[in-house]
UniProtKB/Swiss-Prot annotation:
Protein name: Large ribosomal subunit protein bL31B
PANTHER family (UniProt xref): 50S RIBOSOMAL PROTEIN L31, CHLOROPLASTIC, LARGE RIBOSOMAL SUBUNIT PROTEIN BL31C
InterPro entries cross-referenced by the UniProt entry: Ribosomal_bL28/bL31-like_sf, Ribosomal_bL31, Ribosomal_bL31_B, Ribosomal_bL31_sf
UniProtKB keywords: Ribonucleoprotein, Ribosomal protein
Transport found in the keyword field: no
Family to which this protein belongs: Belongs to the bacterial ribosomal protein bL31 family. Type B subfamily.
Gene3D superfamilies given in the database record: Ribosomal protein L31
GO BP: translation
GO cellular component, one term: ribonucleoprotein complex
Length: 80
């Protein structure tokens, strides 16, 4: 790799905001928040969805309530 053209690649801790689970990995992402992990301090990056909470990886299905949208459409435009 050419020196001086790549972003800083360092260890960071990602936290899933849904489950609260944290994991240590390497990233170019930075944060002012930090967390202690096994006696060392690392930047903390929060993510709404990770493999720990994503429906594809967990096998859980989330039902999307589209019935409310259909009823709203029918009230507004009626049935023809």
């Amino acid at each position: 790799m050419k020196p001086g053209i790549h972003p800083d690649y360092h260890p960071v801790v990602f936290q899933d905001t849904t489950t609260g689970k944290m994991f240590l990995t390497r990233s170019t992402a930075t944060s002012t928040r930090t967390v202690e992990w096994e006696g060392k301090e690392y930047p903390l990056i929060t993510a709404e969805v990770t493999a720990d909470s994503h429906p594809f990886w967990t096998g859980d299905r989330r039902i999307v309530d589209s019935a409310g949208q259909v009823e709203k459409f029918r009230r507004r435009y009626g049935t023809r």
